[in-house]
Amino acid sequence: MSGTGLFLTFEGIDGSGKSTQARLLAETLRAAGHDVVLTREPGGSPGAEEIRRLVLEGDPDRWSAETEILLFTAARRDHLERTIEPALAAGRVVICDRFADSTRMYQGLSRGDLRQLVDQLHALMIGREPDLTLLVDMDPETGLSRAKGRQGSEERFEDFGPELQQRMRAGFLDLAREYAHRFRIIDGNRDMDSVAADVTEIVLTHLNRTR
């Protein structure tokens, strides 16, 4: 960890409820007296939000897979410099809805086997992993149904369909095994409050152990 801060990320397929759980966790930790920054990727800083609009809206085929990975990495670098690292240096808890693990999955798998390229760019330009990653594991069909029910123009990932959702879920579970020291898997196929209770218990245990 940088300074005394804690860097937490939420990951999962679209429709898994991770964004809701990130928000609920932020509210719970703030109520307990923690100084929390709730952020997201792509985005989380003015420059990164501009890149978000480029990659999530409009025709995805206007970028090659390699160009898209560069855009996501550029957004993450700006987010890291302007939001995440200053907050961690100040001792704050940073909760991020998606981080590099999502790029490893969506760009690394969905547009060809580019995982090695994603990891090389990450090592060169980002150089850090979260302290704790909460994977909200969800049945892919249920997640896709939820995601399709959302309104808005950022439909990029939801357009991938059920087959890719299955691959993404399997890929996230593989990542959880690869980075077992920082991943915690949470069953997202339950009501929101039950999931939130598990999230809170895991995070408070981690905070108590590291502070």
UniProtKB/Swiss-Prot annotation:
> Could you tell me the gene encoding this protein?
tmk
| PANTHER family for the chain | THYMIDYLATE KINASE, UMP-CMP KINASE 2, MITOCHONDRIAL
UniProt keyword ATP-binding, yes or no: yes
The family note in this entry says: Belongs to the thymidylate kinase family.
Q: Which SUPFAM superfamilies match?
A: P-loop containing nucleoside triphosphate hydrolases (SSF52540)
MF terms per GO, please? ATP binding; dTMP kinase activity
Q: Which GO terms describe its biological process?
A: dTDP biosynthetic process; dTTP biosynthetic process; dUDP biosynthetic process
InterPro entries found in the cross-reference section: P-loop_NTPase (IPR027417), Thymidylate_kin-like_dom (IPR039430), Thymidylate_kinase (IPR018094)
> Which lineage ranks, top first, belong to the organism behind this chain?
Bacteria, Pseudomonadati, Pseudomonadota, Alphaproteobacteria, Rhodobacterales
| Class of enzymatic activity (EC top level) | transferase
| Short name of any one Pfam family annotated for the protein | Thymidylate_kin
Reaction(s) catalysed by this chain, per the record, are: dTMP + ATP = dTDP + ADP
Q: What is this protein called?
A: Thymidylate kinase
- EC number of the protein: 2.7.4.9
Which residues does the record give as ATP binding sites? 12-19
UniProt keyword list: ATP-binding, Kinase, Nucleotide biosynthesis, Nucleotide-binding, Transferase
| GO cellular component, as recorded | cytosol
Q: So what does this one do?
A: Phosphorylation of dTMP to form dTDP in both de novo and salvage pathways of dTTP synthesis.
